[in-house]
């Protein structure tokens, strides 16, 4: 696909601010300078009328910041059952031998397990929990399907960091996700405190797309899931975003849930505290935003990272308890 370069608006300390005037409005990892491109998509679709889960004030907060933290969504029994399931999976040889299981760099400690909603009946039920799925449907203004699910673990003393990134940048370039009409929800299964590497988000960063430097190597996912080196924003763009919006750590008790936009800049520090951290991530994508071909001739990533074999709307479960 031949692209016409975007129009340059102005330079800011080495970062080019652009308006989208090209075929791919969110071009990234091309042979050009790092750039900041204004978002061309809504944040809350259909004015939040598709479902009734969040209040008007909560929707406004999400639209402004690019995320929202909901506390005490799941009770102690729910959290205990889910955490036990994640711990079981992370020590099950039949699961840890799969490509879905990612270990820490330089260690055999499990860092992430992908496709958990298909590897576990309990997590499958969680994926369809009304407390999660109705929020996704309301924000995205449509029925939704599971683009990706994973459990992220950060063991005490040795859990590694996740560097700053926008999920959409990767999903757009490497998976062919057309537009910014997806979100992640992180279900906290342990207390996330200031010391054990909580998720950190940059408020307002979802309104600007950071076009990144560097072409994507073949099978990039094999390295990026351990330590991402391509599709990461340049330091000047990160500094600009942080100076504009600050950085907010999602410190909260187990049972809380963070919903954040697919383009919100986020990352987390390593965990050198004694307290492990464990969260389950569900990525809901709109049924009107299904994947196309990856950009720039890349081959599709595996199904457990980016679902594309079938796009089937998730039906909310009737029961809300996950402990049973």
State what each model feature region is.
Residues 76, 170, 266:
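Glycine-rich nucleotide phosphate-binding loop and flanking beta-alpha elements
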Residues 194-264:
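Double-stranded beta-helix
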Residues 13-145, 253, 322-323:
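N-terminal auxiliary "cap/dimerization" subdomain that precedes the catalytic jelly-roll/cupin core
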Residues 165-169, 232-244, 295-299:
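Short, surface-exposed loop/helix-turn segments at secondary-structure junctions
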Residues 1-2, 6-17:
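Short, Lys/Arg-enriched N-terminal segments with co-localized hydrophobic residues
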Residues 106-116, 120, 131-201, 206:
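Conserved double-stranded beta-helix
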Residues 172-182, 245-246, 252, 275:
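A short beta-loop-beta micro-motif enriched in histidine and acidic residues
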Residues 19-48, 92, 96, 215-218, ...:
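Non-heme Fe(II)/2-oxoglutarate
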